[in-house]
Structures are given as structure tokens and as C-alpha cells.
Amino acid sequence: MEHKNLRSTRRRYALILIILVGIILTSLALINTIGSDSSKNQLKDNHFISKTISVGSFPVGISVNPSTNVIYVTNNQSDTVSVIDGKTNSVTKTIKVGDGPAGISVNPLTDMIYVTNYYSDTISVIDGKTHVVVKEIPVDSTPWGIDLNSENNIVYTTNYFANTISIIDGIENNVITTVKTDKPWGIDVNSHTGHVFVANRDSVNVSTLKGDVMEKIAISDTPFKISPNNVSYNEKTNLLYVANSSLISVIDISTNSILEPISVGMNLVGLTINSDTNMIYASDIQNDVIYIIDGSTHMIKEEIKVGDHPIAVEINPETNTIYVVNEYSNSISVIIS
């Protein structure tokens, strides 16, 4: 009997041990699975270059039509605009424009594209349905930046050496008026609020224009340390971001107050924002990288190596695809996650 009880006891202990081992192994497997899933989710947040698209000589400007998923790139020395299909990420057409095309902006509601021609002092107007230039609009000297208000169909161009902003009627495609400012370069227009923001490159300030009211916001008292190249506005947070030489200035538009800047990079030029995700994208032409910055914390999330001299960056908010203009590589980096 004692031997039977002993064997029975041993069997029970063995069974318990087997069960415990099974529980431990199951737990470890579960942990590994969770870790694996977490790793997969983390990878989804990591961006990478999915394709590099060859375009014309010295591309400098880019605009995306999210309604048609078509991307337009200005090729400064080729005097052309490359048309890219966002589905295939391939060039479908090349359009001849004026001398030295630089800035470009598309109205998704009318499917009209506007191009600044830096050396011929004109704006080329392209019909997005036919991709044919339908008009050339004379403006002041050396137009560079351009953006538009899609709701009232008003187009704004920065004329660098003329120290002016041309305001154009997008229906008649004629200049309505011209506003004075100081060495304007980058520009961002918000269609919902009607605000126009301009980076005055040599004056260390930003102009804000709404209606006929022009204000200037000084972003630094050290004019030799920074140079405002570009601006981008997040209407949901009411914050304006300014790409400078080695930092991004942050302005609270509700009070026009300067907040803590974002220290990043060496020479920031390209700048864009996805207001829906509150993510900021900035290009550094010295380090040849794109910085992805969390708009809620102003911390750098990712740093992506791209082509040579990334002068501009744009995002399609519908597909969350990022397009980077590599000026010296004559290419576009397509970044996805």
C-alpha cells in the first residue's frame, strides 16, 4: 500500500510539474507573441524610402493634388514641370514652362497649377486636366514661393528681389494687387482661416497677411544666426513653424508669441505639416536628411537619409506619402511607413 501511495503521489507531483511547465511555456510563448506584435507595430511607425524617381535638372519645388493623387515638380534648369502619378510613382508627362521654374502650387478644387518662373518674372498657369499651359501672368522680379487659397481662388507669390507679394485672381488669372515686404521667400496660405504667412529670408521675421492687414513677427534678435527659409501652419494647433538655418521657430498665432524653438539640423529649407496627424517634416540640405517631428512634443521621431540637397518636402495627406525633392540628385525620394 505504501508503495502504491508513493507511486500515486509521485504521479500527482509529475502531473503538477507538467502542468506548471506547460503554463510557463505558454506564458513565454504569449510574451514572445506580444513582443513580436509590438515589434511589428513599431516597424509600421518607421518610415523608409520606397522609391526614387528621376526628374529634370535641378528640381526645387513640389506640390501634390490629393484629389487626383498627382504630384508636380519644378525642374529649375530644365524649365519644365514633371508630372508624377502617385499610384505608380512614375513620371507620366513633362511640361515646358517659363525660365527657371521654382515654386509650384495646385488648387485641388479647380485642378489648376501655378508655377513661379524665377528668371522670366512670370507665373505659368497649367490646366491639370490637359497638362497644358493656358496662361503666363507677369509679376514682379524673381518670383520664388507660391501658394493659394483654394476656397476663394486667390494665389500669392513671393517676389524676392522686388520685396513684394503678388496677389492673383485665380479665376481671371490676373494680378489684383501687390504688397510690400522684405525679401520674401517661403509662403503658406491657410484656406480656412484666410491667413497668409511669409518667411522674409534676409530680415529675420515673418509676415502675416489677412485681408489688407500686414503684420511682421520678429523671430530672433540675432540676424546673423538664422535665416527664415520656409513656413508651415497647423490650423488645428494654431502654431506656425518657420524653417531656419539650424532650428525651427514656433509661433503661437493666437498671440503672435515666440515659443521654444526646435533645435534640429544644420540648414533647414523644406518644411511641411500633416495637420491630421500633427507631424512636422523638415529637410536639411547640409546633412541630406528629412526629420520627422512630433508636433505634440516637438521631439524628433525619425531621421531619414535621402538624396543630395533635399530642398523641398511635401506630403499627400490622403495617402500619408512623403515626397522629397533632391535638387543635386535630380530625383524625388518617396517615403512611406
Tell me what each language-model feature is.
Residues 5-19:
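N-terminal Sec-pathway targeting helices
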